[in-house]
A protein has these predicted regions:
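N-terminal, charged/glycine-rich beta-strand/loop interface patches
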Residues: 1-102, 107
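Broad gene-expression machinery/nucleic-acid interaction feature
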Residues: 3-5, 50-52, 83-85, 112-114, ...
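A short, polar/proline- and glycine-enriched secondary-structure boundary/capping micro-motif
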Residues: 27-29, 49, 74-79, 108-110, ...
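A structural signal for small-residue-enriched, beta-sheet-centric alpha/beta enzyme cores
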Residues: 39, 129-236
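Feature marks extracellular polysaccharide-active and adherence modules
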Residues: 58, 118-120, 150
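Structural motif
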Residues: 62-64, 95-97, 124-125, 183-184, ...
Length: 236
């Protein structure tokens, strides 16, 4: 397993320090202030890859994690599964934004993504996930996405999504229909403990918001392309 690691700590005058920024090929990390960008040095993931990123945001620190480009998951000759795991711990009064570019699941690929986040009670979070089934003209491969988020040591969200671009049920009107992208945006904002500050819930044909227990909201959306998907996920 290839492990990359980030540790963010609160610095002087509210700044954020990164005492640990450890890349592990093919996961290469590049920092600018409190923003870290993930560069996939060798492309992929490729079937058989097992990659892990460990993130720790200390009390009062802020970290934004992005990727430079979309991840394109491709099959290997043996048809092996690829696995990417992200584990994050966010301390008291700290903030973490996880805003990677979309993950494209190529035809013939099998991929699993696992995200585990542990938040302090006064921590805040923005977490966006975007999946694309196939490149242009492809139906896409198989993907399983698991998301576990705890707040104050208690479960906040448990989500599992399994899709197969070659499966007729996945492509039926009951699941994706004509959509090729699916995504979610999870926001945890302690200020929403005050109901007057929480945005009103909403829903539409292709997206909806769901208020979770505590000061948290999950938006889920379907779209024909990533531009439309990101627009839907940006609605508060």
């Amino acid at each position: 397993m290839d492990l990359a690691r980030i540790v963010a700590c609160r610095g002087p005058y509210g700044s954020t320090r990164l005492p640990v920024l450890a890349s592990q090929a093919p996961l290469v990390l590049r920092a600018s202030g409190s923003v870290v960008r993930l560069v996939a040095a060798a492309g992929g993931p490729l079937g058989g890859d097992v990659l892990c990123l460990d993130v720790e945001v200390g009390d009062g620190a802020q970290l934004e994690l992005r990727s430079v480009a979309a991840s394109v998951v491709q099959p290997d000759r043996a048809g092996q599964e690829s696995l990417v795991t992200l584990r994050a711990r966010v301390g008291a009064g700290a903030h973490l934004s996880l805003l990677p570019e979309p993950t494209v699941i190529c035809a013939g690929a099998t991929h699993r993504a696992q995200t585990y986040v542990s938040l302090g009670l006064s921590a805040s979070l923005r977490l966006r996930e975007q999946l694309v089934l196939g490149r242009e003209g492809e139906r896409g491969g198989r993907v399983g996405a698991l998301l576990h988020v705890d707040r104050g040591g208690r479960p906040l969200l448990r989500s599992t999504l399994n899709l197969d671009g070659a499966d007729d049920v996945t492509n039926s009107p009951a699941v994706l229909g004509d959509a090729r992208t699916v995504g979610s945006m999870l926001t945890v904002d302690p200020s929403w403990e005050d109901p007057a500050l929480r945005p009103a819930p909403w829903s539409g044909n292709d997206a909806a918001s769901l208020d979770l227990e505590g000061p948290a909201r999950l938006i889920t959306a379907l779209a024909g392309d990533t531009v439309a998907l990101r627009r839907l996920l940006s609605i508060r």
